[in-house]
């Protein structure tokens, strides 16, 4: 059945391409919406870190989706039905994401693939096939992720306003606090890497923790040095076209000189956040495309399945994410970055930091959560800190509706593809 494996691998790349086109907005949309990065710069940064996240941490979440929802055991589900079911789930996800991306809907790719996996399990009418406890845990994480993301974003932005923006001298306050913010970012990323087990493959935990602490100290010192060396606290006399300051000024004429300096420093911190978010997104969402491929390969060739094979599949998924965001990612980036609420670097920083911590932590513990839920929750948290009038409720309604539609749509498409495969090959 090598021909089926070839089709599945192509389908995995196709699905990863659509994931990159739809879900990349969660990683870089706030940076583009805040004017920190151009679309070209955002694609370049995301391409590098999405791929790294996919190949370094993606295998943990792959294990949850591949074998944690539907059992391929011989006495419960036949090998042929499992292969057909995973193939159906894969193509159902790709088709639905392509439809959503065409209309600019920021749907949850995790919803789509889990809906697809559950779809073929339900059509078999074998209740024992589906691990409902795993499904319940995943659904709870989906409900909790926007609440947690929004709560942290609200707290972070409220702190920024009180400790920096509302101060009599916001520039001095920003210069004092910026090193601590960068240190927290680096510590969070390092801690997530340690908890995920990825670093443990190379060095022992005590050594890894000491390295992280060293990087935190370096980030703190480098920020102090960088702010003064690059004169970030002083505005230049002339603003060149196409520069960061030019983009910030083009977004709003309400910036005073002091606030423009503050937002400029936040912009550089937000670039770090964009890298963190891209890494976290790649580590979590590559599983949505590669888990069915890995599951089918394991069912067809159990003797040759190995970590090396899984690494090849993860690399393929990472490349698919990169091509998707480079060719079609702008549609949903526009929705996330510009249509929900007005973002500035300080607001985008709050969204990015809270989202990155939530998503990467979930990936480290093997929970396939929805990055869309987390980011939208974080954007809502920042918006609510400014008042309900700052939020585009019509867009929020459309996004929430897409959350409810995606699971049944993925299941329905999966059932259709599953029955089609059975009719053709059985």
Swiss-Prot record:
- InterPro entries, from UniProt? Phos_transporter (IPR001204)
* Keyword entries, A-Z: Cell membrane, Membrane, Phosphate transport, Transmembrane, Transmembrane helix, Transport
**Domain of life the protein comes from:** Bacteria
The answer to whether keyword Cytoplasm applies is: no
| GO BP: any one term | phosphate ion transmembrane transport
A GO cellular component entry from the record? plasma membrane
* GO MF entry, a single one: phosphate transmembrane transporter activity
Tell me yes or no: is Cell membrane among this UniProt entry's keywords: yes
Where, by residue number, does the polypeptide cross the bilayer?
Answer: 1-21, 37-57, 83-103, 104-124, 140-160, 183-203, 207-227, 260-280, 309-329, 365-385, 399-419
Protein's cellular compartments: Cell membrane
Its placement in the membrane is given as: Multi-pass membrane protein
Family from the record: Belongs to the inorganic phosphate transporter (PiT) (TC 2.A.20) family.
Q: What does this protein do?
A: Potential transporter for phosphate.
Q: What is the name attached to this protein's record?
A: Putative phosphate permease TC_0064
């Amino acid at each position: 059945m090598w021909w089926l494996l070839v089709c599945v691998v192509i389908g995995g790349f196709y699905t990863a391409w659509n994931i990159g086109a739809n879900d990349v907005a969660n990683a870089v949309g706030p940076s583009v919406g805040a004017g920190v990065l151009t679309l070209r710069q955002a694609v370049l940064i995301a391409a590098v870190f999405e791929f790294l996240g996919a190949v370094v941490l993606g295998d943990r979440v792959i294990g949850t989706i591949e074998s944690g929802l539907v059992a391929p055991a011989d006495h419960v589900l036949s090998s042929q039905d499992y292969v057909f079911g995973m193939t159906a789930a894969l193509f159902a996800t790709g088709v639905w994401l392509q439809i959503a991306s065409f209309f600019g809907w920021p749907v949850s790719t995790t919803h789509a693939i889990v809906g697809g996996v559950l779809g073929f399990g339900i059509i078999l009418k074998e209740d024992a096939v589906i691990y409902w406890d795993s499904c319940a845990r995943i659904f709870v994480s989906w409900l909790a992720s926007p609440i947690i993301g929004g709560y942290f974003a609200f707290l972070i932005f409220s702190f920024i306003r009180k400790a920096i923006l509302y101060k009599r001298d916001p520039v001095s306050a920003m210069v004092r606090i910026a090193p601590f913010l960068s240190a927290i970012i680096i510590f969070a990323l390092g801690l997530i890497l340690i908890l995920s087990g990825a670093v443990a493959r190379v060095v022992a935990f005590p050594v890894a923790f000491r390295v992280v602490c060293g990087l935190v100290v370096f980030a703190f010192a480098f920020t102090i040095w960088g702010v003064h060396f690059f004169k970030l606290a002083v505005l230049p006399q002339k603003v060149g076209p196409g520069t960061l300051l030019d983009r910030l000024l083009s977004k709003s004429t309400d910036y005073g000189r002091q606030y423009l300096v503050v937002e400029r420093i936040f912009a550089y911190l937000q670039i770090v956040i964009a890298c963190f978010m891209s890494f976290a997104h790649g580590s979590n969402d590559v599983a949505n495309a590669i888990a069915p491929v890995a599951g089918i390969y394991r069912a067809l060739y159990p003797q040759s399945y190995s970590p090396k094979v899984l690494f090849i599949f993860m690399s393929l998924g990472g490349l698919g994410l990169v091509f998707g965001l480079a060719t079609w990612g702008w549609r949903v980036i526009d929705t996330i970055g510009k249509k929900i609420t007005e973002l500035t670097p300080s607001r985008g920083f709050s969204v990015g930091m809270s989202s990155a911590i939530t998503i990467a932590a979930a990936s480290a513990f093997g929970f396939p959560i929805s990055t869309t839920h987390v980011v939208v929750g974080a954007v809502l948290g920042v918006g609510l800190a400014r008042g309900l009038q700052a939020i585009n409720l019509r867009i929020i309604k459309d996004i929430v509706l897409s959350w409810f539609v995606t699971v049944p749509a993925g299941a329905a498409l999966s059932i259709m593809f599953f029955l089609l495969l059975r009719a053709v090959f059985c």
